[in-house]
């Protein structure tokens, strides 16, 4: 875990990507559910 200098660990990329994707999907579905998604 300490040898991550000069290269981003793959688990960190996967975690950040997963959080971003889940966040975007959550915002999209919440917006469409509350009626704000129809105006996009």
Swiss-Prot record:
Membrane-topology annotation of the record: Single-pass membrane protein
Compartments reported by the entry: Plastid, Chloroplast thylakoid membrane
Record carries keyword 4Fe-4S: no
Coiled-coil spans in chain: none
One cellular-component annotation, GO: photosystem II reaction center
Gene Ontology biological-process entries: photosynthesis
InterPro entries: PSII_PsbJ, PSII_PsbJ_sf
Keyword Transcription regulation appears in the UniProt entry: no
Keywords assigned by UniProt, alphabetized: Chloroplast, Membrane, Photosynthesis, Photosystem II, Plastid, Reaction center, Thylakoid, Transmembrane, Transmembrane helix
Residue spans crossing the bilayer: 8-28
Superkingdom, taxonomy of origin: Eukaryota
Xref: Pfam families: PsbJ (PF01788)
Subunit structure: PSII is composed of 1 copy each of membrane proteins PsbA, PsbB, PsbC, PsbD, PsbE, PsbF, PsbH, PsbI, PsbJ, PsbK, PsbL, PsbM, PsbT, PsbX, PsbY, PsbZ, Psb30/Ycf12, at least 3 peripheral proteins of the oxygen-evolving complex and a large number of cofactors. It forms dimeric complexes.
UniProt family annotation: Belongs to the PsbJ family.
Protein name: Photosystem II reaction center protein J
Organism listed in the record: Pinus koraiensis (Korean pine)
Originating gene: psbJ
